[in-house]
Amino acid sequence: MKTGHFEIVTMLLATMILVDIFQVKAEVLDMADNAFDDEYLKCTDRMEIKYVPQLLKEEKASHQQLDTVWENAKAKWAARKTQIFLPMNFKDNHGIALMAYISEAQEQTPFYHLFSEAVKMAGQSREDYIYGFQFKAFHFYLTRALQLLRKPCEASSKTVVYRTSQGTSFTFGGLNQARFGHFTLAYSAKPQAANDQLTVLSIYTCLGVDIENFLDKESERITLIPLNEVFQVSQEGAGNNLILQSINKTCSHYECAFLGGLKTENCIENLEYFQPIYVYNPGEKNQKLEDHSEKNWKLEDHGEKNQKLEDHGVKILEPTQIPGMKIPEPFPLPEDKSQGNINNPTPGPVPVPGPKSHPSASSGKLLLPQFGMVIILISVSAINLFVAL
């Protein structure tokens, strides 16, 4: 039986696609400038309270795979959360996102690969993030989970963890720094290089989080490293292996992109360190917790105190409208606000008051005149009465 030209072309294309899928591709280690690296430092509460819960509902409804992964992790988290120490501000959605990513990453599922590739490319522009990134809520909750579980560098960087990859390449020169560009698991057991193409990364992380307590069974030390932690890269001996030493900083091209922040030309260092307070009391179900969480700011002097954000390349984007979703107006950036003053962020847009949300409504504060105005009104009334008499 003769095979037609069309059938031959189809078979060749199918073969090429299969080869591309199963081929182990070399990983380039660099600053991952196309990754979506927002840390939401200036808009954490606004995002968490006002926008992300609705985003999660919409993204789960439109992405069946995400919905399945989330619901499976939700059940695991419910059974696990009473057995581990947690910071006071650590919420269920943080734990669910963490459990979901750990499970999918360990099993190397299609969802893990889909999410990782999306994160690595969604930062090309704000439009790519807004229109093309399907995991905005998942990314937010996972980022916040790692921030809240973070410990001081002195405690986390003493022990080396390892990661292997097929033919990782790094171009030495300049600062010799790199970021992974996606959330990365590393292990305490050093693997043996099976061939010359396998690269072993020895990683000393400051901002990575030990996650073995989140697993169902005891295991070796496993560390989840944030995508934007900056490492100093050096070569180990004469082979392909590399040493990655954290500089105890992250850097980001984005800050509150969902609220209008544009991509900066340079990767801006984030100098905020979160000092969580941990709680553990599984026996008391209705335990009431007071929020004693605090942030210890380690701010460095980068020039004048009132240095403008424009000096760092921060730009403001006009609001972009997505069909079926409300995107808030971009946050204004005052000229006298310094880059380091992230403890007093610029107020966001005020929503239109709804029922019982305005101060004059029955559920709010009464709008009373000031005391001085009351005195003036009484005086005027008395004068008018005296004149009339």
Curated annotation (Swiss-Prot):
Protein name according to UniProt: Ecto-ADP-ribosyltransferase 3
Record keywords: Cell membrane, Disulfide bond, Glycoprotein, Glycosyltransferase, GPI-anchor, Lipoprotein, Membrane, NAD, NADP, Nucleotidyltransferase, Repeat, Signal, Transferase
Family membership noted in the UniProt record: Belongs to the Arg-specific ADP-ribosyltransferase family.
Annotated EC: 2.4.2.31
Region of interest (3 X 10 AA tandem repeats of [GS]-E-K-N-[QW]-K-L-E-D-H), residue spans: 283-312
Any Pfam family: ART
Main location, first listed in the record: membrane
Gene: ART3
Biased composition (Pro residues): 346-356
Position of the signal peptide: 1-26
Lipid group attachment sites (GPI-anchor amidated serine): 362
Membrane topology of the entry: Lipid-anchor; GPI-anchor
Post-translational modification: O-glycosylated with core 1 or possibly core 8 glycans.
GO cellular component, one term: side of membrane
Protein location: Cell membrane
Binding site for NAD(+): 101, 163
One GO MF term attached to the UniProt entry: NAD+-protein-arginine ADP-ribosyltransferase activity
Disulfide pattern: 43-256
Residue ranges of the propeptide: 363-389
Chain positions carrying an annotated carbohydrate: 248, 346
